[in-house]
Amino acid sequence: MTTERSDPTALALRLLARREYGRRELGDKLLRAGCDAGDVALALDALAAAGYQDDARYVEMLTRTRVRQGHGPLRLRQDLQRAGIEVGADPEIDWLQQAQAVCRKRFGNTPPADARDYARRARFLAGRGFTGETIRQVLGAGRERDFAAD
């Protein structure tokens, strides 16, 4: 009789019933659970062939989640690389609009009051994973030069 620990397919199905996983992430979980590496590879191939595990679907789910959480393209790319997914073309998302919404939610509609406020907002957006160009567009191109005289 095989237990769930020794049956990677059953364990993988239980994990996939809760949420999507990338192939490498799911394989790592199965290996940590004590499953044999050869059995894990076979189980992952079978699950992918049956349509239970799909990296493209995982990328879509992760993209939706990160956008909803207010993260930018750099953070999304980092999360995909961490999950072992080849980073292809950027999804069709208006990152400028996303960054504006995140900034507006955090700081309101007022522009940065001074250089210190500008830097604080820029750090916040950079920490969320937005590019420097997007940050400059959101905070107002040239505004950092206006504050240099302060």
From Swiss-Prot:
GO terms for cellular component: cytoplasm. The keyword Cytoplasm applies. Keywords: Cytoplasm. Its main location: cytoplasm. It is found in: Cytoplasm. GO terms for biological process: regulation of DNA repair. Pfam families: RecX_HTH1, RecX_HTH2, RecX_HTH3. Belongs to the RecX family. Modulates RecA activity. HAMAP family: RecX. This is Regulatory protein RecX. It comes from Acidithiobacillus ferrooxidans (strain ATCC 23270 / DSM 14882 / CIP 104768 / NCIMB 8455) (Ferrobacillus ferrooxidans (strain ATCC 23270)).
